[in-house]
Regions:
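A short SAM/SAH-binding and catalytic strip from SAM-dependent methyltransferases
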Residues: 103-117, 140
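Class I SAM-dependent methyltransferase SAM/SAH-binding core
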Residues: 41-95, 104, 119
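Conserved donor sugar-nucleotide recognition element shared by glycan-biosynthetic enzymes
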Residues: 19, 23-27, 49, 71-74, ...
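Conserved Class I S-adenosyl-L-methionine
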Residues: 2-8, 22, 49-51, 166-258
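Conserved hydrophobic/aromatic "anchor" residues
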Residues: 8-9, 15, 97, 102, ...
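A short glycine-rich, Lys/Arg-flanked "PGG" loop and its adjoining helix->strand segment in the class I
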Residues: 118-133
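Conserved class I S-adenosyl-L-methionine
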Residues: 1-40, 51-55, 59, 72-77, 133-160, ...
Length: 258
């Protein structure tokens, strides 16, 4: 069973320390790839705790940005973090905005978790004006070293549990997704980020507090399993001593609406 339709759980703070350290630098490069610039109006679908939203607000201003996020907790975080921002607590397949409401509609690190990815892409295209840009990006399979280490725990301690979804995690499948949705001038790219850490605990502690895909449900582990999991995790990272860096690599796609 894959992690289709996943809604992340855990505190927003833990998520930011877990995946936000990757999604924040990714957002800047993704927005560059899309060509986000004033005076555009943009939508962030599956906004999470706001990594991409923050980059869009920085470039366009809060009045020109809207966000869709199905998690009640994360939607509340978005409203607190960006006062006055148009935040709707909805999934990507059910966007409430009218046709042609935006110049650009983006979905960062979400398409693989949707129940209906093709339907969501069509929704992004619908709310984007003709000639506007629709784009998404997703971590490649084994593209995030930290997630590979978590998957090692799953394989060794919980082999019968859910496995991470693998579709829409490469340029070819993303291109096909967009072309079949009727988008034009489809282009793909790969984006790589690097994150610095000082200790293994700096990464492990938020990892065990955040639910969602990419690894085992470590929050339900017994103390003995947690100890085993941490040892496996450290081994998978190469038993680092002192500071170390981990890479993340994403596939990205953009297309023109209408």
């Amino acid at each position: 069973m894959s992690a289709r339709g996943t809604v992340f759980s855990g505190s927003s703070d833990a998520y930011d320390r877990f995946m936000g350290r990757y999604s924040t630098p990714l957002a800047e490069q993704f927005a560059d790839f899309v060509g986000v610039a004033a005076p555009q109006r943009a939508l962030d679908v599956g906004a999470g705790t706001g990594a991409l939203t923050a980059e869009l607000v920085r470039r366009l201003g809060a009045d020109n940005v809207a966000a869709a996020e199905p998690s009640t907790d994360y939607a509340a975080t978005l409203r607190e973090r960006f006062p006055g921002l148009d935040v709707r607590e909805v999934p990507g397949e059910e966007l409430p905005w009218e046709d042609a409401s935006f110049d650009a509609a983006l979905a960062q690190l979400v398409v693989v978790f949707l129940n209906d990815a093709p339907g969501a892409v069509r929704e992004l295209a619908r709310v984007t004006r003709p000639g506007g840009v629709v784009a998404t990006c997703m971590w490649e399979v084994d593209g995030v070293e930290m997630m590979k280490a978590l998957n090692e725990i799953r394989q060794r301690l919980s082999p019968g549990g859910p496995t991470p979804a693998t579709d829409y995690r490469d340029e070819a499948s993303l291109r096909k997704l967009f072309e079949e949705a009727g988008l034009r001038e489809v282009e793909t790219s790969r984006i790589e980020v690097s994150v610095e850490y000082e200790t293994v605990d700096e990464l492990w502690e938020p990892a065990i507090r955040v639910g969602g895909p990419g690894g085992p449900a470590v929050r339900s582990f017994t103390p003995e399993q947690l100890a085993q999991g941490r040892a496996i995790f450290e081994e998978a990272l190469g038993n680092p001593r002192g500071g170390y860096s981990l890479k993340g690599r994403a596939a990205a796609v953009r297309g023109v609406s209408g």
